[in-house]
Amino acid sequence: MQWEVVIGLEIHTQLATQSKIFSGSATTFGSEPNTQASLVDLGMPGVLPVLNEQAVRMACMFGLAIDAEIGKRNVFARKNYFYPDLPKGYQISQMDLPIVGKGHLDIALEDGTIKRIGVTRAHLEEDAGKSLHEDFSGSTGIDLNRAGTPLLEIVSEPDMRSAKEAVAYVKAIHALVRYLGICDGNMAEGSLRCDCNVSIRPKGQTEFGTRCEIKNVNSFRFIERAINSEIQRQIDLIEDGGKVVQETRLYDPNKDETRSMRSKEEANDYRYFPDPDLLPVVIEDSFLETIRAGLPELPPQKVERFQTQYGLSAYDANVLASSREQADYFEEVVKIGGDAKLAANWVMVELGSLLNKLGVEIDQAPVSAAQLGGMLLRIRDNTISGKIAKTVFEAMAAGEGDADSIIESKGLKQVTDTGAIDKMLDEMLAANAEQVEQYRAADEAKRGKMFGFFVGQAMKASKGKANPGQVNQLLKAKLEG
């Protein structure tokens, strides 16, 4: 039997506010346990929550960016459940009247096609604390620094049909919230976490199968692996005569499998009711228009502009626009270096390899956009060749200065003096007289490879400094003469 996969995602994004959603406590990551928890965060009697306006503003920014309906009147509700890191015994969230309603986000698939993914809703809520197991023998520690950190939970429609589509959607959300500046997107620190709802059904069937939720997956790679593992588990289970049970599961990356965590709760299990300590939030049109006017250029518009303005392919434009920092870096390089396609190649390939090797983001790149742009100018005016440019790039990455100073100090300037190149070629051909005779006796089909030998010898003789175009032109004339 052929199976169709149905995937919906819930993405929890920590909003980049300076203070928590209902208290004035700081949200800095990595502080000593329980040093950023106020009486409000601890759920002490008699204290009242005060809504952080910046969290509301950031949620509205996201809603406008995905062309969603904004709830002009939205209500906070208490989600009741018991867990050690939830001091109040309930979480303040939104249920019936969320701040962001239906919207959509377009994702680019591997074959270049665009698929629209529906967003059901996005609602504001507070994060819970964190249970600590590592440093406690036979017990669990509780860190409430994270309790009350503002979250925007983004709930998709079940529109994805493969793990790769799911990853593309998460990457698109990740890029969008970083472009907007509402979340730093640091998945390793838990700033963006994903719950994956997965089900299967016979191909052609319209009714959904029983879904399982994979909780708190925190990397693109693990999202793909977790979903594929769960898909295979459900297929094997059904084909062996079993039934999928609705439940919450955890992904174990070491064993590459999901395992049962608990039975999946429904909304009525949480006994939602409006929080009596918080008034409904009323959002006026003027508030939204101010936010709309301040929205930055978003990834889809940037991709389109990169293609039309710079003549880039759809693939290159998507890669370069995948983060706001990378897009800005690229445009700064183009502004100085002039050639967009050359700049795109160096940013994606050479700089990308360097960043991967160092394990850093582009905003920590050891080669600045000004340095790279300056080096590209020297390629374009034939001061250095593309091959020599790699040596210059390595030196810039090592902190040895800008391109001009490195070229000067290392004597890397390309030889463009026709007389000097002509003399060097004569000496090289004289040293390879036998190969010259073989070349002249060979038919046209074999000459191409043999010509490459002479080019290599010429570049070796010039220590890579001879202008490749001039070498090719003069060499061909000498060999054919």
Swiss-Prot record:
Short name of any one Pfam family annotated for the protein: GatB_N
GO molecular function: asparaginyl-tRNA synthase (glutamine-hydrolyzing) activity; ATP binding; glutaminyl-tRNA synthase (glutamine-hydrolyzing) activity
Highest taxon, organism lineage: Bacteria
Catalytic activity reported: L-glutamyl-tRNA(Gln) + L-glutamine + ATP + H2O = L-glutaminyl-tRNA(Gln) + L-glutamate + ADP + phosphate + H(+); L-aspartyl-tRNA(Asn) + L-glutamine + ATP + H2O = L-asparaginyl-tRNA(Asn) + L-glutamate + ADP + phosphate + 2 H(+)
Classification via InterPro entries: Asn/Gln-tRNA_amidoTrfase_suB/E, Asn/Gln-tRNA_Trfase_suB/E_cat, Asn/Gln_amidotransferase, Asn/Gln_tRNA_amidoTrase-B-like, GatB, GatB_C_1, GatB_Yqey_C_2, Gln-tRNA_amidoTrfase_suB_CS
Enzyme nomenclature, EC number: 6.3.5.-
PANTHER family in the cross-refs: GLUTAMYL-TRNA GLN AMIDOTRANSFERASE SUBUNIT B MITOCHONDRIAL AND PROKARYOTIC PET112-RELATED (PTHR11659), GLUTAMYL-TRNA(GLN) AMIDOTRANSFERASE SUBUNIT B, MITOCHONDRIAL (PTHR11659:SF0)
Family according to the record: Belongs to the GatB/GatE family. GatB subfamily.
Quaternary structure annotation from Swiss-Prot or TrEMBL: Heterotrimer of A, B and C subunits.
Annotated protein name in UniProt: Aspartyl/glutamyl-tRNA(Asn/Gln) amidotransferase subunit B
Record gene name: gatB
